[in-house]
Amino acid sequence: MHSVLRGKFPIIGSGFGSALRYGAVGVIAAFAFAGCSGPSSQDEVASAAMQSSVTEPASDGSPARLRLITSEQYLNTLGHTFGPSIDLGSKFPPLQRTKGLLANGAATAGVTAAQLEQYQRTAASVAGQVVDAEHRNFLIPCQPESEKAADKACAAEFLEEAGRLLYRRPLSEVQVAEAADKASVAAAELEDFYAGLAIALEGMLISPEMLFIVESAEPDPTRPGHERLDAYSLASRLSFFLWNAGPDAALLDAAENGEIQTPKGRARIVNMMLASPRLESGVRAFFDDMFAFDDFDTLAKDPLVYPSFTGVTVADAREQTLRTVIDHLITKKGDYRDLYTTRSTFLSPALAAVYQLPATPGWSRHEFPADSPRAGLLTQISFLAVHSHPGRSSPTLRGKALRELLLCQPVPPPPPNVDFSLIENPDSEYKTQRDRVDAHLENPVCAGCHKITDPMGLALEAFDGAGRYRETEKGNPIDTSGSLDGKLFENVVGLSEALRDHPALPSCLVERVYSYGSGGPSSPDDRDLLSYFNTRFMEQGYTFPGLLRAIAMSTAFTAVTEPEGLSEASAQAHAPYEQYAADHAK
């Protein structure tokens, strides 16, 4: 819409300094869908809070963060604010993975000019749709006196209401006036009220206040000498954590009236958020991140080797695991550890072809029998196919993924100049992958790392590189026995059981969830705190909602320290905006 005129109307927001000044927080939410649902009585809230046999250790919490919202969070923001009928386009390239999570990478990421260009294209498209004839009557709360002229009052009403959700806090009078002025100037020039409003809205959608979460601290009245997140920052941190999107109007109201800063108020809010249908999207986002499912974006198999493995298979494999996670952890409120031994899952026609099962239309629940080698997430296509090569399986990649993704145990990279030709050649003199790995391990330089990964990965040789079950490799029996940190097993089901009982499995999840919720990687100083959350997790039967509640209700979740260099980081983050504005003003 009127793209040639945009240079006359700067679309960049009013300055990153205002985000620090007013404490830009959390992320958006339901402009069209207000409120939460869930338990409301004090008895239910008290019951949900759950008493513990352990006391939370003293902690200064995490540093107040400045971080870029992820692509998915940005699109969720727009979707929850303007409704499902707005076409949001596709996700942007992911951020860098840091300590196991893309979300952690957001705490260290800035935005480049190229990324800003992507945001701008999405913002322009969304803003144009919001004001078009199909949407304006139910998204814009007023009508201009004339569609061919500026109406500052109507523009201000809409931009103030939308801006509260987009910026995750109320706009100042100055910000409202600046946005309305921008809309009015553009409308007068273009002789089109809605075109001017779209330009002002587009500026909001790519402003630093929208794209960056800048957490603000305030003195903690309950702990003299310590600081806590201010109310709007806490609302945002909770909303990103549990919903992977920003606070809706009800949550912002709870921040405005101070309820969110009281123990009873926060307990009520957390329980309502955990009972909301929006929790599913938040849990999906976390496990999609933890399981490194962004690897699906580049997953491809050799069609000559795996002709039944298609692009539909790729999408459905990801969806199968996420459906299994939601069903087990949220619907059934099951033990997290049992995800790795469960026989219950869901199948689509494309997956049925790889699982070698009869296909039924659409998605259907499926229960593998007790004598099946399919037990838990390790035996699903999402794990087996992603952690393989395009034309063959890889015990090393699978064992490495098990260690790093599920047990939080980093595996060192291979030393330089290692000859992998032996294990990469399926046509060598060695009959099976185990034989090839054993021969490769005769090189002492290689043995150290492979002993960390391959005893588990070789058990998964029961499945080929696409995830299909097999008992032989080129006519030779496959030996699926192995060990996991001293626990011996005879087959892949035994591996699943050994993983299920490994003490690092729940503790790894705890560390990942706390990092995800606090907006950045944990530190060695968090050791006692993580131990406390582990105990709470165990006491509550390893239920995932219980873990989310324990973290969200902790003092550490809201306690913050003021990091050094925040102003410098803010200035660096703002630099691309200044350059972008200069380029578009020419």
Q: For the regions a protein language model found, what residue spans apply to each?
A:
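N-terminal secretory signal peptides that target proteins for export/translocation
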Residues: M1-S18
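Sec-dependent signal peptide hydrophobic core
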Residues: L20-V27
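C-terminal motif of bacterial Sec signal peptides marking the signal peptidase cleavage site
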Residues: F33-G35
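Active-site substrate-binding loop specific to GH73 endo-beta-N-acetylglucosaminidase modules
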Residues: S37, S52-S53, G79-G517, D526-F544, ...
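Bacterial Sec signal peptide processing site at the extreme N-terminus
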Residues: G38-A49
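Surface-exposed beta-strand-to-loop junctions
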Residues: T55-P57
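Mature N-terminal segment immediately following signal peptide/propeptide cleavage
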Residues: D60-S90
